[in-house]
From Swiss-Prot:
Sequence similarity: Belongs to the leguminous lectin family.
Sites where the protein binds Ca(2+): 122, 124, 126, 130
PANTHER family the UniProt entry points to: CONCANAVALIN A-LIKE LECTIN FAMILY PROTEIN (PTHR32401), LECTIN (PTHR32401:SF45)
Keyword S-adenosyl-L-methionine belongs to the record: no
Organism annotation: Vicia faba (Broad bean)
Protein name per UniProt: Favin
Binding-site list for Mn(2+): 120, 122, 130, 137
Organism lineage: Eukaryota, Viridiplantae, Streptophyta, Embryophyta, Tracheophyta
Keyword Calcium belongs to the record: yes
Pfam family, one: Lectin_legB
Keyword tags: Calcium, Glycoprotein, Lectin, Manganese, Metal-binding
Misc. remarks from the entry: Binds one manganese (or another transition metal) ion and one calcium ion. The metal ions are essential for the saccharide-binding and cell-agglutinating activities.
Glycan-modified residues: 168
Length: 233
């Protein structure tokens, strides 16, 4: 039988039951707040149930799609840090280094023990690993904060960013689309050999960080659907 995991959170509740909060993450009426506009914070929120993302017996990998709306709001609209991610990590995942590491990684060198894939929405230029053009960007990260693929992105401060992320298990392509209400859009895709990177069972979630500069990072809604094909007996 196929394993299907599906959930939809059209808006968050103060006592949201199916989330695990880490660092500064919490829910209020209708939204998930990862960071407030204060310096040097890390906030994360995970879906409470582990997800079976691949199966060692069959070798099968799940197809999945997740959609969410997030808002980054910096008080002055200009000095913004550090960014927001959707990530896939081991079931026992804990907050990692803050600041430019976005709460999901601890270094810029490839670390296979991290077993983490993230899609980052990076608002602050870290010269040691970010694209040399110095621009804000969307990135796909595999076991390191240094993205394997990036797309420059103009943050619309305080606006709702509508995101869809999907993984095609046949092609191993991870695709990201971001759309603002004024129809400015961005797309990015890259091959990610998921079963060579993450454990069979994972947690999924969001993280956000601030540093010397800051912003509020909020999620307004979240859906997820994965399908892992069972043995073909």
């Amino acid at each position: 039988t196929d394993e299907i995991t599906s959930f939809s959170i059209p808006k968050f509740r103060p006592d949201q039951p199916n989330l695990i909060f880490q660092g500064g993450g919490y829910t209020t009426k209708e939204k998930l707040t990862l960071t407030k506009a204060v310096k040097n914070t890390v906030g994360r929120a995970l879906y409470s149930l582990p997800i079976h993302i691949w199966d060692s017996e069959t070798g099968n990998v799940a197809d999945f799609t997740t959609t969410f709306i997030f808002v980054i709001d910096a008080p002055n609209g200009y000095n913004v840090a550090d960014g927001f991610t959707f990530f896939i990590a081991p079931v026992d995942t804990k907050p990692q280094t803050g600041g430019g590491y976005l709460g999901v990684f601890n270094g810029k060198d490839y670390d296979k023990t991290a077993q983490t894939v993230a899609v980052e929405f990076d608002t602050f230029y870290n010269a040691a690993w970010d694209p040399s053009n110095g621009k804000r960007h969307i990135g796909i990260d595999v076991n390191t904060i240094k993205s394997i693929s990036t797309k420059s992105w103009n943050l619309q401060n305080g606006e709702e960013a509508h995101v869809a992320i999907s993984f095609n298990a046949t092609t191993n392509v991870l695709s990201v689309t971001l759309l603002y209400p004024n129809l400015t859009g961005y797309t990015l895709s890259e091959v990610v050999p998921l079963k060579d990177v993450v454990p069979e069972w994972v947690r999924i979630g969001f993280s956000a960080t601030t540093g010397a500069e800051y912003a509020t990072h909020e999620v307004l809604s979240w859906t997820f659907l994965s399908e892992l094909t069972g043995p073909s007996n």
